[in-house]
């Protein structure tokens, strides 16, 4: 019984720590949103938030960063953007070796694989709408399935209650506003 009380108390401490980080970091995130890309890459800011704010374990962080790199590569390919060879090599390795071999993914693939699948389907639907010139708020939201996976990772690591309490911080990780998206789509 003492062990059970210990684990319950430990769980409450983790939730309290996550809530505190979320409350203090959301101000930190919003105050730096405009300079995020000037002072670091998106991967840098994602990693920093995964460590400092979301308190994710190393394997989960590596899996999420690898997934980010793969998603960015495929998005650049589809958009016809210039691709850096080193980035392509890293993403190929991540897609074929790093992601499936990651211990966090292996432990949770029954949850993560359907989420990745759904994110791809939502991205494809969004892309189809955008190519038809019908970009809208829904296509903007559907193209950001990566952040659904980040939130699910928080839930897997810290539990449902913690994910509910810190979800708004995950939402703020998305670096593009609806206005920026609509402007980009009108110029495409």
PLM feature spans:
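All-alpha prenyltransferase/terpene-synthase fold signal
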Residues: 1-188
């Amino acid at each position: 019984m003492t062990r059970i009380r210990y684990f319950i108390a430990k769980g409450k401490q983790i939730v309290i720590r996550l809530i505190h980080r979320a409350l203090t970091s959301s101000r930190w995130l919003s105050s730096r949103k405009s300079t995020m890309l000037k002072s670091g890459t998106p991967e840098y800011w994602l990693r920093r938030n995964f460590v400092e704010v979301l308190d994710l374990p190393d394997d989960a962080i590596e899996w999420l960063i690898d997934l980010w790199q793969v998603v960015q590569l495929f998005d650049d390919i589809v958009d016809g953007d210039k691709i850096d060879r080193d980035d392509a090599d890293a993403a190929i390795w991540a897609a074929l070796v790093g992601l499936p071999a990651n211990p966090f993914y292996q432990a949770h693939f029954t949850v993560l694989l359907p989420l990745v699948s759904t994110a791809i389907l939502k991205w494809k639907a969004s892309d189809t709408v955008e190519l038809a010139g019908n970009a809208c708020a829904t296509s903007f939201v559907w193209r950001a399935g990566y952040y659904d996976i980040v939130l699910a990772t928080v839930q897997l690591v810290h539990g449902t209650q913690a994910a509910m309490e810190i979800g708004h911080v995950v939402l703020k990780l998305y670096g593009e506003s609806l206005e920026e998206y609509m402007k980009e789509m009108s110029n495409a």
